Amino acid sequence: VGDGQPGGLPDILIRGSNSVTQSNAPLYVVDGIPLESPDNSSIPTQNIKSIEILKDASATAIYGARGANGVIVITTDSGSKGAPKINFEYRYSLSKDYNRYEMMSPYEFVRLQNELDAAYGSMYLDGRDPHPDGTPWTLDDYKNVRPIDWQDEISQLGQMHEYSVSASGGTEKTTYMASFNYANQKGIILNTGMKNYVGSMNITQKIGNRMQLVMRANYAEKERTGMQVNYGQGSSAYMYKVWSYRPISTNGVDLTHELEDPERPESGVPMFNPLLQTQNTDQKYITRQLRTSAMFNWNILKCLKFTTSISYTSTESQTDIFNNSKTEAGSTLPGRNDGINGSRRVTRTNNVLNENTLNFNKKFDNIHDLAVTVGCTQQKNVSDIFEAKAT
């Protein structure tokens, strides 16, 4: 499940909603690196070799409490023996919003306002300037008035361009896989978009007949711009403001150019123009992530295997927001805000993980199986946050 905004992450549930206050998202393990809050766009689908879902006791047996919501194990392609192969892909896609809510016509809207509150609803009849011939407005006159469909005003045809190039090959001892991916998306909401860059390199080296070294590196950078539709409150939070804005103007007022509904304050509930809000939103969300890992496998005996790995993950998230005078947050309307303002927030996280396992697996007399696993894990996680605001 996702909110459909450019670069938005899907909400995946494996074992249902086990908690009301905590995250129900599964643990991701990408090439042996546990990631509790991964950006899926940093893992191009073209590079995925296999996906395994752990949803029973095995998830907690291996990953402890982190696997309580299930585990998604992703392994990326490491290349294969053979002559070098170059692959290039280009994809172009279009997106459009469907299943829109059917909005009230001007006639239906005015009739409802009069039924709910005759005093407030009268501004569309007695309170409106008369026709050029001096006759007052009647309810039936609104049957010929063209409505403002704010869903049309704030939307556009979404487009996405995706480019992917990869090189792979290898010998009996060494295999490799290198790739670069770029995506550029224009969202279905005005002034929204996303750019995504991903580069990765995987090398597998056999050492003798019993040992293997696997090295992986991945760098991803994603930039999202424009209105973020969920605000952490659900995908409809932004659209509620669009659906609730009145579809008609009165007395020559062009609602599409007014930041605040000039009639709405009389009812005690301020309403802000969703079109101007969308057009003037200046928000940028940048995520940069570097993942590196090395894994050493040693088949000591036919029934005994030792594996050790070390990984380093560095993640930086940057949020830049500027609210100008044509936005709700930057307006100087009485009782609203302090005017134009801006902010920057940067979060950096560095994670180092070392895992060591010794596996014994042997079958006795073709009847009995004995499997024993001994492991040791060390992990260090350091985070820091910087934030600045100005008005």
Task: State where each predicted segment sits.
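Functionally critical loop-and-helix segments that line ligand-binding/catalytic clefts
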Residues: 299
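Short, small/polar-rich motifs associated with maturation and membrane association
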Residues: 1-200, 205-220, 291-292
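Surface-exposed loop/interface segments of Gram-negative outer-membrane beta-barrel transport/assembly proteins
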Residues: 80-146, 187-192, 198, 202-291, ...
